[in-house]
From Swiss-Prot:
Residues bound to ATP: T9, F10, H14, P15, G16, H17, N92, Y119
Name of the encoding gene: ribL
Subunit architecture: Homodimer.
CDD domains: cytidylyltransferase (cd02170)
Molecular-function GO terms, alphabetical: ATP binding; FMN adenylyltransferase activity
Stored InterPro entries: Archaeal_FAD_synthase, Cyt_trans-like, FAD_synth_RibL, Rossmann-like_a/b/a_fold
Catalysed reactions, as listed in the record: FMN + ATP + H(+) = FAD + diphosphate
Species: Methanosphaerula palustris (strain ATCC BAA-1556 / DSM 19958 / E1-9c)
Gene Ontology biological-process annotations: FAD biosynthetic process; FMN metabolic process
Name of the protein: FAD synthase
């Protein structure tokens, strides 16, 4: 059985996330998805959606066989437990595949590292773009204590 690992924050799920996971699943039989812990996300603003809810959403996606939260201190610990054949990277993940491959070898892991291409030029295939769109279209009405009716948002 060929095991694939995909990783990410998966905040504000969008079609780009789904594309990444669908393409990852095509590379093997079993797809494991490691969802970043809230406190480990340092390369961008903290997630909007709490880690347990992001995990629940990712686990519900059709291509995903197993979803788990990442380790809080060692990002390689779940990889060592899963022992995947392939680790996929999203097109915008800041890992250098060659550097990751060397780090895996140092831990006696021989997974192939594959970068998945982008979903294309879609307007809302980025969590950052979704947040920007909400601010642009709803910003003035998003004040605490005002317009709490979901129909107004």
């Amino acid at each position: 059985m060929r095991r694939i690992v995909a990783t990410g924050t998966f905040d504000l799920l969008h079609p780009g996330h789904l594309f990444y996971l669908q393409e990852s699943k095509k590379l093997g039989d079993e797809l494991y998805v490691i969802v970043a812990r809230d406190r480990n996300v340092k390369h961008k603003p903290r997630p909007i959606i709490p880690e347990e809810q992001r995990l629940q959403m990712v686990a519900a996606l059709k291509p995903v066989d197993h979803a788990l939260l990442g380790d809080t201190t060692d990002m390689f610990r779940p990889i060592e437990a899963i022992r995947p054949d392939v680790i996929t990277l999203g097109f915008n993940q800041n890992f250098d595949p060659a550097v990751l491959t060397e780090a895996l070898k140092a831990r006696s892991l021989s997974a192939e590292v594959v970068r998945i291409g982008g979903y294309g030029d879609r307007v809302l295939c980025s969590s950052r773009r979704i947040v920007q769109r909400v601010i642009e279209t709803r910003g003035p009405s998003l004040r605490v204590g005002q317009n709490t009716d979901p129909e107004d948002l």
